[in-house]
């Protein structure tokens, strides 16, 4: 047998700083199940295709999940198509190398590639890294119609470039356990008819959250509730759904939520999911043939569910605070006076946080040279007196939950909730973080709760780790499903802060990129670095502004700043070395 070794490099998209360009909008399909025509741009096999070209085009075709990957199956022989199991998660690969051994009518190929992430059958994308383990040989045979794949590994390998062209990112919204706000659950779905977008998203809401969120959120659209039919325009038309002034009409049945607050939350899930996907209102929501709420029989608007706005910044009215020379100050124009009460008077405060309602604060006091335990946590109203909640050799920066509990990490390993009873006396309640420590051993140097209180982002030995927050029926709290975000950040993370429910800002030891962003998928990107002086330590963020502490003081970056020309701007009253920004959160 004549052997010819051919090396082909497929897909030249480089992964820059671990950052992947993720598409953000278009209309979806559930992976591998929806029966629709394939997009016209997908490749098809032709009689004159060489084996290497056919394999490359096959990887592109796997990006379309319709009809159990029918577009990709056209590249297979009948027997290979029957044997191929395309169920489950797909691996997203780049920098593919094929090594061929060929004869006249048969080619055997081994595949090497870099893994950039995975895509579950629910459309949940997570970044990854490393080399693709050998999936086994791919065999091609010569047929009357040209070369075809006759043997291939089970599972789906998605070409990264084609994934970017085919899949778009949308966000489903579920309800936090307190019924206060909505919680993002990003999904990636394949492009199809835009008039079916709303139907697909509502169907996904009814199907429920991703597995890691099932015990952290509520879903007011749980079965037995279901759609009576496709989502239409508000007037019942089937085209132009959610575009222009057409609005959207959602007809549901088997509703079990009867109280007004639950119905309001159900509407919030639908409205924020559709609105953030570009499906414009008004939103006519009917259940069992009648309006969900008679007040909105002609349609809901986002303003009707503004209390649950996922983009809102709770406690924003409290404004920016900071620790300057160890005491808490508040920004007042070009002044930064100490706040009244204990927080403004106490020295040696090394970290602090304002409560999410902007009325209370928590700070860690650590006098230099003090004997163990050296750090103490103090909680109280802004402008009032404080009580000591706990102590430890070290205590991390405090973070507030929606139920007014303060979370800290004691001694780098013990996650603790401090919560005050009706009399104001604080209780110290341990959080079960064994799922985190068993997978990511090492001290937790920073822990910050998401604004909806359902997730915790941590810095562990310079890596960004995300975990879900679950409350058991007996009232215990657990950190669950830990996973690493932002592989491109390496081990450079110092501090982090949630900018939104889906976006985390990270300060780093990297002088080229001292501040970066990472989202819930794990995709990271870099913020501007102009005007920052290393080292950059604490970061505090809200949807409108990011604040960091660098060598000279506190600087800010507006979310509306021009990306090409933006630089960090000094917060003049806080330009004191060692000053640390403090926001609600």
Swiss-Prot record:
<dbReference type="InterPro" id="IPR023959">
    <property type="entry name" value="Lipoprotein_LpqB"/>
</dbReference>
<keyword id="KW-0732">Signal</keyword>
<comment type="function">
    <text>May modulate activity of the MtrAB system in controlling homeostasis of the cell wall and cell division.</text>
</comment>
<dbReference type="Pfam" id="PF10646">
    <property type="entry name" value="Germane"/>
</dbReference>
<keyword id="KW-0449">Lipoprotein</keyword>
<dbReference type="InterPro" id="IPR019606">
    <property type="entry name" value="GerMN"/>
</dbReference>
<keyword id="KW-0964">Secreted</keyword>
<dbReference type="Pfam" id="PF10647">
    <property type="entry name" value="Gmad1"/>
</dbReference>
<keyword id="KW-0472">Membrane</keyword>
<dbReference type="InterPro" id="IPR018910">
    <property type="entry name" value="Lipoprotein_LpqB_C"/>
</dbReference>
<feature type="compositionally biased region" description="Pro residues">
    <location>
        <begin position="37"/>
        <end position="46"/>
    </location>
</feature>
<comment type="subunit">
    <text>Interacts with MtrB, probably extracytoplasmically via its sensor domain.</text>
</comment>
<feature type="lipid moiety-binding region" description="S-diacylglycerol cysteine">
    <location>
        <position position="19"/>
    </location>
</feature>
<comment type="similarity">
    <text>Belongs to the LpqB lipoprotein family.</text>
</comment>
<keyword id="KW-1003">Cell membrane</keyword>
<keyword id="KW-0134">Cell wall</keyword>
<feature type="signal peptide">
    <location>
        <begin position="1"/>
        <end position="18"/>
    </location>
</feature>
<dbReference type="GO" id="GO:0005576">
    <property type="term" value="C:extracellular region"/>
</dbReference>
<dbReference type="GO" id="GO:0005886">
    <property type="term" value="C:plasma membrane"/>
</dbReference>
<feature type="region of interest" description="Disordered">
    <location>
        <begin position="24"/>
        <end position="46"/>
    </location>
</feature>
<protein>
    <recommendedName>
        <fullName>Lipoprotein LpqB</fullName>
    </recommendedName>
</protein>
<feature type="lipid moiety-binding region" description="N-palmitoyl cysteine">
    <location>
        <position position="19"/>
    </location>
</feature>
<keyword id="KW-0564">Palmitate</keyword>
